C-alpha cells in the first residue's frame, strides 16, 4: 500500500467534557472539512464528532497525523500543543481495529449502544458528499459497517445496553423518586431527545415540552409522545413550569444561562430543578452549578449509571472483540493486495511470457502437430505457470500488513524473479 491509514482522536477516556467541547468538530464537517483531502500529506479523510469523541480517519503519505492535528487545532482556533496531550494516534492495523471497535460500540461509554453506528454512517455520508474519501476509506468504512452488523448478529453485546438518554432519565429518578408528578422539557429534537422522551414516558412522566430551533421538527417529536412543542426563543420562560430539563442541541454556545434559572427559581419558590446536559459543547452554563436547589449533570456524570449496566455485557464484549480481530486480519489482506497487486500481475505475466516462448520453441522443434496435441501442450504450460506461481503469490498475499509495510517483501520478490527488467525471459543461450 502506497499510503498509510491514521486515526487521530480524543474521547471520553482521554478528555473531559470541557476539552471535548473545546475541540468538537460537529459543525465544521459540512462547511470546511478543513480542506484536508488533496492537500499536503492527506489524500482521504473522514470526521466523526459526537458528544463522547472526536476522531479523524485519514489516509495519506508522510506526516499525516501532524497535518491532521494542525488542521484540527486550526479549525478550532487553538494551538496544536493545547490539543496534543489529549490525543491518541493509531496507524494502519491499529487504526482499523479501533474503527471496527468504535463502529461495533465496543469503545463507547455505553457498551453496545446503537447510536454510534448511525453517527459513523452520517459522518461517512458527509465525507463522501465532500468528495473527501477514496478507494481505501470507502472500503474501510463499508467493512466497518459490516463488522458492526456481524457483532450485533453473533453476540448479545447490545441486548441490555442502555443509551445515554436512558442513563439521564435513571439519574432523574434517583433525584425525584416518583416521576409521575413532574414535568419535563427537552431542548433539542434529535435522536438523543427522542430516546429521552421515550424513557421519560416509561418512567411515568406524561407532560413533556419540546423546544427546538426548528419548530416543525419539535412539533413532530412532541406529537409522537403526546407532548407540546414551543418556539425555541420561548424556552427560558417555560423553565418555571418544568422540573426536569434534558438538553441535546448542537449549539456552540450555552443556551441556558444562570440568570434564566435564577429567575425561574424565584417564581418556583425554590422547588428543585434537575438539568442533564448531554450536549458537547455543553448547552448549559456551568455556573448553574452554584445555584441552590439546582442539580446539573453533564454527560461525564452519567458514567456511574452506565457502569452498573456494564457487567452483564462484558463476556459478550470479549466475543465481539474476537470478531473484530478476525475482521482486521481479513481487511489487512485486502490492504496488502493493493501494493502487492502490481507485483503479482508482473509475476503472472512473466510466467505466461516464459511459457509462450518455450511452447513456441517446442512446437517449432516438433514440426506440424494436430490440434489435440497443441491444446494439450498449451494446457500443460498454463498449469505449470499456475503451480510455479502459487507459492510466491501466497507468500505475498497472506503475509498481511505490518507497521513497517509490505515494501521489503515486495522488493525481495521483485529481485528474486527479476521483475524490473523487460524483454525476453530466456535467451537461446539459456
From Swiss-Prot:
Site keyed Important for activity: positions: 98
Record keywords, A-Z: NADP, Oxidoreductase, Porphyrin biosynthesis
UniProt KW Oxidoreductase keyword: yes
Top-level taxon: Bacteria
PANTHER family attached to this UniProt entry: GLUTAMYL-TRNA REDUCTASE (PTHR43013:SF1)
Family label: Belongs to the glutamyl-tRNA reductase family.
Signal peptide bounds: none
Record remark on domains: Possesses an unusual extended V-shaped dimeric structure with each monomer consisting of three distinct domains arranged along a curved 'spinal' alpha-helix. The N-terminal catalytic domain specifically recognizes the glutamate moiety of the substrate. The second domain is the NADPH-binding domain, and the third C-terminal domain is responsible for dimerization.
Residues engaged in binding NADP(+): 188-193
Subunit structure: Homodimer.
Protein name: Glutamyl-tRNA reductase
UniProt organism field: Desulfovibrio desulfuricans (strain ATCC 27774 / DSM 6949 / MB)
GO BP field: protoporphyrinogen IX biosynthetic process from glutamate
Its EC number(s): 1.2.1.70
Chain's role: Catalyzes the NADPH-dependent reduction of glutamyl-tRNA(Glu) to glutamate 1-semialdehyde (GSA).
UniProt gene name: hemA
Enzyme class, first EC level, given as a word: oxidoreductase
Amino acid at each position: 500500500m502506497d499510503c498509510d491509514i491514521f486515526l487521530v482522536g480524543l474521547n471520553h477516556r482521554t478528555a473531559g467534557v470541557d476539552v471535548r467541547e473545546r475541540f468538537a468538530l460537529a459543525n465544521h464537517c459540512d462547511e470546511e472539512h478543513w480542506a484536508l483531502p488533496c492537500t499536503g500529506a492527506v489524500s482521504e479523510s473522514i470526521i466523526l464528532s459526537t458528544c463522547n469523541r472526536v476522531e479523524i480517519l485519514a489516509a495519506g503519505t508522510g506526516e499525516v497525523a501532524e497535518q491532521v492535528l494542525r488542521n484540527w487545532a486550526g479549525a478550532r482556533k487553538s494551538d496544536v500543543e493545547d490539543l496534543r496531550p489529549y490525543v491518541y494516534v493509531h496507524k494502519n492495523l491499529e487504526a482499523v481495529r479501533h474503527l471496527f471497535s468504535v463502529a461495533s460500540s465496543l469503545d463507547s461509554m455505553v457498551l453496545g449502544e446503537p447510536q454510534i453506528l448511525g453517527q459513523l454512517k452520517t459522518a461517512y455520508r458527509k465525507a463522501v458528499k465532500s468528495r473527501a474519501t477514496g478507494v481505501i476509506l470507502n472500503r474501510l468504512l463499508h467493512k466497518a459497517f459490516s463488522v458492526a452488523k456481524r457483532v450485533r448478529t453473533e453476540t448479545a453485546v447490545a441486548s441490555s445496553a442502555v443509551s445515554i438518554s436512558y442513563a439521564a432519565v435513571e439519574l432523574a429518578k434517583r433525584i425525584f423518586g416518583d416521576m409521575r408528578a413532574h414535568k419535563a422539557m427537552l431542548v433539542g429534537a434529535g435522536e438523543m431527545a427522542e430516546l429521552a422522551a421515550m424513557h421519560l414516558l416509561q418512567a411515568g412522566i406524561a407532560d413533556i415540552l419540546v423546544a427546538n430551533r426548528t419548530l416543525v421538527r419539535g412539533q413532530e417529536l412532541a406529537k409522537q409522545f403526546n407532548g407540546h412543542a414551543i418556539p425555541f426563543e420561548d424556552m427560558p420562560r417555560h423553565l418555571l413550569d418544568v422540573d426536569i430539563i434534558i438538553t441535546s442541541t448542537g449549539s456552540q454556545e450555552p443556551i441556558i444561562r444562570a440568570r434564566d434559572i435564577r429567575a425561574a427559581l424565584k417564581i418556583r419558590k425554590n422547588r428543585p430543578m434537575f438539568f442533564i446536559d448531554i450536549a458537547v459543547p455543553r448547552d448549559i452554563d456551568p455556573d448553574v452549578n452554584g445555584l441552590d436547589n439546582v442539580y446539573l449533570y453533564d454527560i461525564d456524570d452519567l458514567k456511574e449509571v452506565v457502569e452498573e449496566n456494564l457487567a452483564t455485557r462484558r463476556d459478550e464484549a470479549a466475543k465481539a472483540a474476537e470478531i473484530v480481530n478476525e475482521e482486521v486480519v481479513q481487511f489487512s489482506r485486502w490492504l496488502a493486495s493493493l501494493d502487492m497487486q502490481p507485483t503479482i500481475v508482473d509475476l503472472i505475466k512473466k510466467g505466461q511470457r516464459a511459457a509462450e516462448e518455450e511452447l513456441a520453441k517446442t512446437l517449432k522443434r516438433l514440426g506440424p502437430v494436430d490440434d489435440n496435441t497443441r491444446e494439450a501442450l498449451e494446457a500443460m504450460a498454463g498449469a505449470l505457470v499456475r503451480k510455479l506461481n502459487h507459492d510466491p503469490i501466497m507468500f505475498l498475499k497472506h503475509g498481511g500488513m505490518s507497521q513497517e509495510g509490505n515494501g521489503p517483501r515486495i522488493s525481495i520478490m521483485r529481485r528474486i524473479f527479476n521483475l524490473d527488467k523487460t524483454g525476453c525471459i530466456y535467451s537461446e543461450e539459456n
